[in-house]
Amino acid sequence: MLGSSAHGPAAREAGSAVTLQQTAFQEDQENVNPEKAAPAQQPRTRAGLAVLRAGNSRGPAPQRPKTRRVAPLKDLPINDEYVPVPPWKANNKQPAFTIHVDEAEEEIQKRPTESKKSESEDVLAFNSAVTLPGPRKPLAPLDYPMDGSFESPHTMEMSVVLEDEKPVSVNEVPDYHEDIHTYLREMEVKCKPKVGYMKKQPDITNSMRAILVDWLVEVGEEYKLQNETLHLAVNYIDRFLSSMSVLRGKLQLVGTAAMLLASKFEEIYPPEVAEFVYITDDTYTKKQVLRMEHLVLKVLAFDLAAPTINQFLTQYFLHQQPANCKVESLAMFLGELSLIDADPYLKYLPSVIAAAAFHLALYTVTGQSWPESLVQKTGYTLETLKPCLLDLHQTYLRAPQHAQQSIREKYKNSKYHGVSLLNPPETLNV
């Protein structure tokens, strides 16, 4: 009895401790995911994820201290005397605000009205030199009648409105005619390719260059590029080949990069690089095209604003009396024919080729000759243009038999008035 009584309290305390531990263990385990509570029943995971999880093996996460829930705005005490005040605001005593109460209407009516001067009147009264404006005077009638020929803008004819909305070309600004022409004449000398560069090329010939230019004409028509883009691309090619030796397997890559640069310089929406890779039938990769573009830019020293035959023709067309669209299209056709053959046209400046093309087109369509106004503007006479004019006339005569026909097919379109189908004159009166 004594033994049982001696061990009774200790046993009861030990039993109660075990019971508390079990209860605490159950309380800790009741919020644990059942799948995590039995790790032996988990499915096998991928090796990668298992390695990541093994590296992150740590003890149980420490329990976060219980924080007080943020009270919503409606539960926050307002104007409570027991709200603690920060020490930096304790000494900042401000007078309590008061609520304004409107007076009754009867009291307002009983209050006598007082005439108060405004601040502006006080200031004006202080300065005796300033006088208040007097009463407004009626407007005096006009002594002369208005022009009755002026029409209301709501009754104007649409033709007048359309005429005002026409964009003005840069070349049609008379104040800058001479400056533009002088600048182009100076730049064409600086951007001129070397005449006999093809003789120093070990692996390419003039016929290969002609095939390349013919292909670029087709590319321009396929993507509806400007004619100026084609002229710029050919200029870039000739200037690049004047300084670099190129194998025949890379000649098309040079032409593609030159056309890409010209389209970026001239077009509003140039084709993407992937389009130029596609037109080469994936002969070159995008990386090769971009590398060649970078090389062409370095060789040309980033000087891309080269004067072309097309630019000079645009200026010469302004001297037609009257303007003739067929003459303009034929002159552009002859100018592009000169791009095909490096020999003999590399020895002529673009302004000279453009002048010869314009005279030949004018003579073919209308029978007229090189205008006197252009003689004064350019300084070129028929005697000056005669060598280039004879070469261009021979090219025009042999165009139907030329191996490259893309330019003739292009100018058969009604857009260019089918000028490539016109018969060239047999002789020239020069």
Swiss-Prot record:
CDD domains: CYCLIN_CCNA2_rpt1 (cd20561), CYCLIN_CCNA2_rpt2 (cd20564). InterPro entries: Cyclin (IPR039361), Cyclin-A_N (IPR032447), Cyclin-like_dom (IPR013763), Cyclin-like_sf (IPR036915), Cyclin_A/B-like (IPR046965), Cyclin_C-dom (IPR004367), Cyclin_N (IPR006671), Cyclins_cyclin-box (IPR048258). The modification Phosphoserine is found at residue 5. PROSITE patterns: CYCLINS. It comes from the Eukaryota. Interacts with the CDK1 and CDK2 protein kinases to form serine/threonine kinase holoenzyme complexes. Interacts with CDK1 (hyperphosphorylated form in G1 and underphosphorylated forms in S and G2). Interacts with CDK2; the interaction increases from G1 to G2. Interacts (associated with CDK2 but not with CDK1) with SCAPER; regulates the activity of CCNA2/CDK2 by transiently maintaining CCNA2 in the cytoplasm. Forms a ternary complex with CDK2 and CDKN1B; CDKN1B inhibits the kinase activity of CDK2 through conformational rearrangements. Interacts with INCA1. The gene is CCNA2. Polyubiquitinated via 'Lys-11'-linked ubiquitin by the anaphase-promoting complex (APC/C), leading to its degradation by the proteasome. Deubiquitinated and stabilized by USP37 enables entry into S phase. Ubiquitinated during the G1 phase by the SCF(FBXO31) complex, leading to its proteasomal degradation. Cyclin which controls both the G1/S and the G2/M transition phases of the cell cycle. Functions through the formation of specific serine/threonine kinase holoenzyme complexes with the cyclin-dependent protein kinases CDK1 and CDK2. The cyclin subunit confers the substrate specificity of these complexes and differentially interacts with and activates CDK1 and CDK2 throughout the cell cycle. Residues 107-120 have a biased composition (Basic and acidic residues). Keywords: Acetylation, Cell cycle, Cell division, Cyclin, Cytoplasm, Mitosis, Nucleus, Phosphoprotein, Ubl conjugation. GO terms for biological process: cell cycle G1/S phase transition; cell division; G1/S transition of mitotic cell cycle; G2/M transition of mitotic cell cycle; regulation of DNA replication. Pfam families: Cyclin_C (PF02984), Cyclin_N (PF00134), Cyclin_N2 (PF16500). GO terms for cellular component: cyclin A2-CDK2 complex; cyclin-dependent protein kinase holoenzyme complex; cytoplasm; microtubule organizing center; nucleus. The keyword Cell division applies. One of its GO terms (molecular function) is cyclin-dependent protein serine/threonine kinase regulator activity. Residues 1-80, 106-129 are annotated as: Disordered. It is found in: Nucleus; Cytoplasm. This is Cyclin-A2. Coiled coil: none annotated. The modification N-acetylmethionine is found at residue 1. Belongs to the cyclin family. Cyclin AB subfamily. The lineage of its organism: Eukaryota, Metazoa, Chordata, Craniata, Vertebrata.
